[in-house]
Amino acid sequence: MFYCTGEGILWISPDDRLIVSRLPAGTYTDVGQEYRRLALRPCTPSATPAFFLDTPEMRMVRREVEAFFDPAATARLQAVGLRHRRGIILHGPPGTGKRTMMRQLIPFLVERDAVILVDCDADYLEHALIPAIRASDPDRPIVLLFDAFDRDVSLSRAKLLQLLDGLTSPDHLLMIGCTNDFNAIPVQLRNRPSRFGLILRIDRLPDGVHERLAEQKYPTLSPADRQFAVRLTRNLPINFLERVCEMFLAGCDPDEISDRFRAIAPAESTDGHERR
């Protein structure tokens, strides 16, 4: 049971506010520390148009998520006494599209009536948030998204282990975590198929992604400016392309952008060789 404030905050403890017996499908974040009580806030959709990746890795992730919502698969698990849970870890260097892939799943998850909880404390999840969601809706699918999974593991390792694979861990639970440092995740957490059925390393963005992103996200730039930005950042994480495009939007010319770019880019040239 939840109690809604005029600002859209959802308390878990009883209150004299509007009662919300069933959370609408959508994305929520824990704001309990801000309000000193257990509470959720709906996440505001980004005003930036989503950039959709269509890669073999994205299709693998999509199939794994679709399998979680397959009623036949759920029934088979229940028939043999297994909990309905799946876990996915996306790892690799920064700027290779891991978090873009995770965000790209959100519309599909909402269509499947899921409650999506972003970067929530593991102890709150098992002992307060998930029970409150399930109180009036015991089979509701819940999806946990962790933007920096290695950080969350370092803060609450034992709690995450309990949440994922403990005797009281919740049913109908999908967890997706992203990390730039896979080795920071303990072996006992990642080496259990019951916890993470898909662990996927993403080393680089496929060819053509920089061009498509520049065209889709920055349509007001001239083709020449977009091509310049793509050439300058082709072998670098996608956030460098965005920085260069934003410099063009701010009125910088190519020479000025090149000078600024040398100060912010890693020690690697656009042809893949280390700068001297």
Where are these regions (language model features)?
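C-terminal alpha-helical "lid" subdomain
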Residues: 2-26, 192-194, 198-276
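Conserved phosphate/pyrophosphate-binding and hydrolysis machinery centered on Walker-type P-loop NTPases
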Residues: 51-55, 179, 231-237
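Walker A/P-loop NTP-binding motif of AAA+ ATPase domains
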Residues: 56-62, 66-227
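AAA+ P-loop ATPase mechanoenzymes
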Residues: 1-95, 101-113, 121, 265, ...
